[in-house]
Amino acid sequence: MIRGILSTIEIALLSALILATRCANYQDVFVAGNIYFVDADCYARMTRAQMCDAQPGLIVRHHAFENFPQGTTPHTTAPLDYLILSLSLLLKPFTAHALDLAGAFVSPLLALLGGWFLWWWSRRMKFQYRWVMLILYAISPILVHGTELGRPDHQSLSMLLVTIAICAEWSRWEATGAATARWAVVSGTAWGLAIWNSAYEALILFVLVIVLLLVLGDKEAPHSGAATAKSRRAGWVCFVLIIAIALLLERRIPSLSILHSSAIFKNWSRTIGELAHVSPANPIWLRWCGYFVLLTPFLIWMSMSGHSRTRQQRTPWLALVLVVPTYGFTIWQARWGYFFVLIFALALPALLAPIKSPAAVWIAFVLSIFPILRDWDERIWPNETQLAARVELRNESAQLRELALSLQSRDVHPFLAPWWLSPSIAYWSGQPGVAGSSHESLNGIEDSARFFLSEDLQEPRKILQNHRVAWVFAYDSERVAQNSAAVLNQELPLHPLCRVLDRTPSQAPPFLIFSAQTAAFKLYRIAVER
């Protein structure tokens, strides 16, 4: 009885902490009765969910709403689309904005499921310092960012599935008898779904794990290797079946951004935060993981040297093979930070196990999370400059939504806008855009950048004609010009078109008719040539 009450209290506290951190940005998501998402990719995802809602059973294999008129073959897949749609069906009896609300809450709910799973799994594994892992999972800023309110992105589902897959592999090592096969099924299913959801990080992690299993061997089949042991056959069947279903439904192999080598892609990727490099000396590591990240090499060495030939020795190898490569990948691309911190948190209880003093561990842990707490202090109580920037962003989002809604029509009236604004305009207006926020939209991104930097009339006119544009959105000319110049890797011209459209609408080219404006945006209609 007492044990059940304590478990309930633990789950309640963990759930409250996870939801409180994930929903800390609610003022930026719920604005004046409307729901806004945190970045451009989220609006692209919600447009996919919108299409599935309008035509249940649809597998979205082509994006006509970006890179118009060619469109794109996206790297995004169906699992998250239908997860959002399923959640919206549950919410429909309670709200008129079920799809938007489902998109806003899907990632925090996935984080909550991940927290519950880790609570159950770590308890089953009898980790002495399990709450170190659970607290870091709940409060790490980058894990929160990947699963926060208003961020319906594939990363949140990937993080949940990768968590389950790695924990299942870990448990399979420790299991005996029939439990070994059961954990293999869980692992194979989770890896299959994770790769279906996103064939990038999950696929690379899966390959690393399989290599690790082949190298270490298996206690049941020491001569065949763990990856091919009999106990894994059911898991492999589940994995292959899910991948086969994914290929059958998606009917395409997603393109990987790392395979792109064009100059435009390299230029554009430098403007994307999640594709940026993270220096090993960057203090953001401490904000993500706390000071314990500095002790990781020592903890791995101490764990391995303390009982080098025992069953527990497999755990440090898991940390070594997954923590170290994901750290290197994060230095290369910041988007790997989600998985580095996730795996770091999973490894911490085992890495701390050789330390026999719980008091020493908890004192060190509390001191180590000071950088994380400082980050939360800045988020919850921002200074005047940060608060003003947030308020400005909310106001701009509301203004852009107002203009976009005015474009709604049964007819197709394509628009041209800065690439990072295009997905939200497409979602609200239902009209296709020239640009987009994915690497598949590079042609449209390049043309929109050339349009805004043009100084003569012929090039922008030709771009509008080629893309059959009916509307043009003008925004802050300084930001648009700088971003466009970065994408094209060229100097800023003296009189770019974006500056004219933003600051002096009366001097706009004759084929651009000034139609509407807000404090931050201006809307131009394309004159029909006779």
Where are these regions (language model features)?
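Membrane-interface junctions at the ends of membrane-embedded or membrane-associated helices
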Residues: M1-R3, M125, W170-V185, L214-K230, ...
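Start-transfer (signal-anchor) and selected internal transmembrane alpha helices
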Residues: M1-V29, W131, R232-C238, P358-A364
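Membrane-embedded helix bundles of polyisoprenyl
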Residues: I18-T21, V106-W121, Y129-W173, T180-L213, ...
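Extracytoplasmic
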Residues: L113, F370-R530
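Transmembrane catalytic cores of multi-pass membrane glycosyltransferases
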Residues: S158, A181-V185, T189-G306
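Transmembrane alpha-helix segments characteristic
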Residues: V237-I242, P297-I300, S305-I331, F344-A347
